[in-house]
C-alpha cells in the first residue's frame, strides 16, 4: 500500500496487515521538511513527517515488517543535510527507503534519466551510510508519474486547474 499519508485512522490497516503478511506499507514523503512537503503535496489533512514516522513505527511494531518511505530526489532535496533530517525522523532499524528516479519533462529522456539516476544513487549512498536499507526505483525514463505516489501529478494538475475547489497547505 502506497500512500501520501492522509490524516486517517490507520488502526484498520494495521489489523489487516497483521492478518495478511504480504501487505507492505510505503509513505510517499519526497521532502525532508514539512515546509517543502506542503508545497509538493498541498493538502491540509495529511500527516506531517513526524506523524508518518510514528505511524510507520506503530505498523512495524504490529506486523514485524519494515515500512518504506519513498523519496524522489532532485537537486534541491538530495543533500547530506536532507539525509541527516530523514535519519533523525525515520529510524533505520524500523524504516527502509525507496529512492525514486524522476525525469524532467523538458530534457531529452535518456539524458534526464542518466542525470536523475546519478542523483538517486548519490543520495542512496548517503542514506545507506546512515544505516538505511534502500532500493532505487528507476522507470528508465518512462512517464509513470501518475502512479505509485497516489497519482500526485494528476492531483496537482487538477488543483492548478480548479483553484477555487482546493485549499493548499
Language model regions located:
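Core AdoMet radical
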Residues: 1-75, 96-98
